[in-house]
Amino acid sequence: MTIGKNNKMIQHLNYRVRIVLQDSRTFIGTFKAFDKHMNLILGDCEEFRKIRSKNSKVPEREEKRVLGFVLLRGENIVSLTVEGPPPPEEGLPRVPIPGAAPGPGIGRVAGRGMPINLSAVPAGLQGPVRGVGGPAQQHMAPMGRGVPRAPMMGAPPPGMIPGGMPSMPGNMGRGAPPPMRGPPPSMIRGAPPPGRGGY
């Protein structure tokens, strides 16, 4: 069954309604939804039932229960009566107003990819601190023509160990070479001295 916009049931969504069932129970609540079988959903629902006592002298009394959100099966419904219009807060838009300041309860979409703030790098992903590990900044800069290069170390000449000391036969097999203290001045490659051609 296709439900059109002119259907009477749609016109009464969010209204307060009174529903009577076959067993004479009455439900009053906010009409939220329905389907082709006339199953109904009520919000803020209360149940009223009349209890007859076994004594005919005592009049029947009405018992009220607060139920909340209720699904009523269509085959048990006898009547549906509109009690009143929807409460005023139901008609207000649920869309945030552009000028309103967001409060702590405003829902936000979960991030799915690149973070919104691209300038902030998450902790642990910044790389090494300047001066600790990695090459110096001068070595990482792109080089152009005519710009003097930063000092770089070349390979040691034959007969020299990396520590800058000439190898001695007596030192062989006695452990690791002494720690490097930097290259000797003759090993630093920079601009050629004046009067000498190229490299």
Curated annotation (Swiss-Prot):
UniProtKB keywords: Cytoplasm, Methylation, mRNA processing, mRNA splicing, Nucleus, Repeat, Ribonucleoprotein, RNA-binding, Spliceosome
Q: Would the keyword Ribonucleoprotein be found if you checked this record's keyword annotation?
A: yes
Q: Where are the sequence repeats?
A: 111-113, 144-146, 173-175, 195-197
Write down the InterPro entries for this protein, in alphabetical order: LSM_dom_sf, Sm, Sm_dom_euk/arc, snRNP-assoc_SmB/SmN, snRNP_SmB/NAA38-like
Q: Name one GO molecular function term.
A: RNA binding
Q: Where is this region: 4 X 3 AA repeats of G-R-G?
A: 111-197
Q: Does the keyword Repeat apply?
A: yes
- Intrachain S-S bonds: none
Impact upon substituting R174L:
Unable to localize to the pole plasm
Gene Ontology CC annotation, any one: spliceosomal complex
GO BP terms: namely:
germ cell development; gonad development; mRNA splicing, via spliceosome; spermatogenesis
Where found in the cell?
Nucleus; Nucleus, Cajal body; Cytoplasm, Cytosol
Q: What PTMs does it carry?
A: Symmetrically dimethylated on arginine residues present in the RG repeats by csul (or csul-vls complex) and Art7; methylation is not required for assembly and biogenesis of snRNPs, but required for pole plasm localization.
Q: In which tissues or organs does this protein occur? A: Expressed in the posterior part of the oocyte and embryo. Expressed in the pole plasm (at protein level), colocalizing with SmD3.
The segment(s) forming the Sm domain are 4-86
Q: Which PANTHER family match?
A: SMALL NUCLEAR RIBONUCLEOPROTEIN-ASSOCIATED PROTEIN B (PTHR10701:SF0), SMALL NUCLEAR RIBONUCLEOPROTEIN-ASSOCIATED PROTEIN B AND N (PTHR10701)
Its subunit composition reads: Component of the osk mRNP. Interacts with stau and yps. Interacts with csul (via the N-terminal region). Interacts with vls. Interacts (methylated) with tud. Interacts with Smn; this interaction may be favored by SmB methylation. Interacts with the SMN complex. Interacts with msk and Snup; these interactions are RNA-dependent.
| Family statement drawn from the similarity comment of this UniProt entry | Belongs to the snRNP SmB/SmN family.
As for what it does, the entry says: Plays a role in pre-mRNA splicing as a core component of the spliceosomal U1, U2, U4 and U5 small nuclear ribonucleoproteins (snRNPs), the building blocks of the spliceosome. Involved in germline establishment and development.
What name is this protein filed under? Small nuclear ribonucleoprotein-associated protein B
UniProt lists the gene as: SmB
